[in-house]
């Protein structure tokens, strides 16, 4: 009986070990399937747009706006909206520079992008619209909600008359280089950088704003529209910062960032808390 009991215990332990081994193998296989499936999904939601680089001349305009339909709703049953589709341009940076020696404007991009864009003039505004209808999507993208557009960077050379640039495109970085003008305003959905820009009066609006090099005499910022902003005080110089907002805001003024700050509350309960690194003249408007 003792021998039989011992043998039974051995068999039980073997069964337990085999069960644990099978469970472990199943878990590893499941994890590998998840990782592979996740990587395939991440790769598959890229929309690659190539083609020979193309440059088109821009007509005269005062406002230049890049835009896209913000969402596309998929309706599979009458009255029922099941999903939305968005196109991210995080892989397509935009460079904004001055026009050529004749101060003419142009727009450069990958040639195949032309199938998904259009240019129209409305008054003094030039609209560049990016649109991706479902019948132009590859089969593997037609069930995706979030599609990432991947293409070479775009270059926008501004006509001399342009006073405002709007980049109303999801996740597109806008990099402003070498601009020299009296007045300019820009608005972007995402990130904006300024390099070697010299502007007398600049109104800037971006989710994330980085002033890296250049000069601005009067900088206008509505803090309601900016999540974060920074100034490289070693290479970017500001005379007066005109700050506004409709709620409570805080800001840090670095040493040598500016000479004066003018705060304009947009509501009665709006306020600005300022941390100073050196003496700065601060004025409050009504």
Model-inferred region functions:
Residues 15-34:
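Hydrophobic membrane-insertion alpha-helices, especially the h-region
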């Amino acid at each position: 009986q003792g021998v039989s009991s011992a043998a039974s215990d051995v068999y039980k332990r073997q069964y337990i070990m085999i069960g644990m081994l099978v469970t472990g193998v199943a878990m590893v296989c499941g994890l590998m399937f998840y990782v592979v499936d996740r990587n395939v999904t991440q790769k598959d939601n890229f929309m690659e747009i190539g083609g020979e680089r193309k440059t088109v001349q821009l007509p005269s305009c005062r406002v230049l706006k890049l835009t896209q339909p913000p969402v596309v709703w998929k309706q599979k049953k009458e009255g029922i909206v099941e999903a939305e589709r968005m196109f991210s341009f995080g892989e397509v940076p935009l460079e904004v520079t001055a026009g050529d020696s004749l101060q003419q404007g142009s727009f450069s991009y990958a040639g195949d992008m032309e199938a998904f864009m259009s240019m129209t003039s409305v008054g003094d505004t030039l609209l560049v619209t990016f649109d991706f209808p479902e019948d132009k999507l590859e089969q593997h993208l037609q069930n995706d909600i979030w599609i990432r557009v991947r293409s070479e960077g775009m270059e926008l050379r501004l006509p001399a008359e342009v006073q405002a640039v709007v980049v109303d495109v999801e996740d597109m970085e806008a990099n402003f280089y070498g601009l020299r003008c009296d007045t300019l305003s820009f608005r972007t959905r995402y990130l904006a950088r300024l390099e070697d820009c010299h502007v007398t009066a600049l109104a800037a609006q971006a989710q994330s704003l980085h002033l890296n090099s250049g000069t601005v005499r009067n900088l206008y910022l509505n803090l309601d529209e900016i999540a974060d902003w920074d100034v490289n005080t070693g290479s970017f110089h500001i005379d007066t910062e005109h700050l506004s907002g409709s709620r409570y805001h805080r800001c840090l003024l670095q040493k040598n960032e500016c000479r004066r700050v003018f705060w304009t509350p947009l509501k009665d309960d709006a306020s600005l808390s300022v941390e100073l690194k050196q003496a700065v003249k601060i004025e409050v408007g009504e």
